[in-house]
Design a protein with these regions (language model features):
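Conserved catalytic-core segment of nucleotide-activated headgroup transferases in glycan assembly
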Residues: 1-42, 113, 149
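A generic local structural motif
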Residues: 15-19, 53-57, 74, 98-99
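PLP-dependent class I/II
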Residues: 26-29, 67, 134
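Donor nucleotide-activated moiety binding/catalytic core segment of transferases
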Residues: 31-77, 82
Length: 157
């Protein structure tokens, strides 16, 4: 994960949990889990926002969530299998220099917000994109036939 401690702080400067709470309402709770290698101090924490960075098993958090907001995390590959909405907050996409395995804009399994304003608009409206998510799951998982070791041994002769 390329983000430094300083860059993680910048992410949280752009992720306004209070504004998101206003948009979603009191029936929603925000669980924030930063990359564990780069924890961020002073994450918002109150009755509607919890820092889950130290929580060991992210898959538990997937199961209790109704929506996943992330940037470039590979976690979307697992989360997409749950068939729940995914929102991608890629405010620095133009500067992101690690590259992707596929076309991020067209292949990722959710709507992409490039700015805070876009993030808030997607949250206010229906940010779900079922066809995009279904295509992503098909792309990621349909070619898994099992027996990878056997196929490698066959290739090696």
């Amino acid at each position: 994960f390329r983000r430094t401690d300083e860059e993680n702080r910048q992410i949280m400067d752009r992720f306004d949990a209070e504004r998101i709470h206003q948009i979603l309402g009191d029936e929603w709770v925000i669980l924030i889990r930063m990359h564990p290698k780069f924890p961020v101090e002073n994450l918002p924490q109150n009755k509607y926002c919890y820092n889950m960075t130290d929580y060991n098993d992210i898959t538990d958090l997937y199961l209790v969530s109704d929506l996943f907001i992330t940037d470039y995390s590979s976690s979307v590959v697992e989360y997409a299998l749950l068939d729940k909405p995914i929102l991608l907050f890629a405010y620095d996409l133009a500067e992101y220099d690690r590259g992707f395995y596929f076309d991020y804009e067209n292949m990722m399994p959710g709507q992409i917000a490039h700015t805070q304003t876009e993030l808030y608009e997607l949250l206010q409206n229906n940010c779900d994109n079922l066809p995009k998510r279904q295509n992503f799951v098909k792309f990621q998982y349909d070619n898994m036939k099992g027996d990878a070791c056997g196929r490698i041994l066959d290739i090696l002769g």
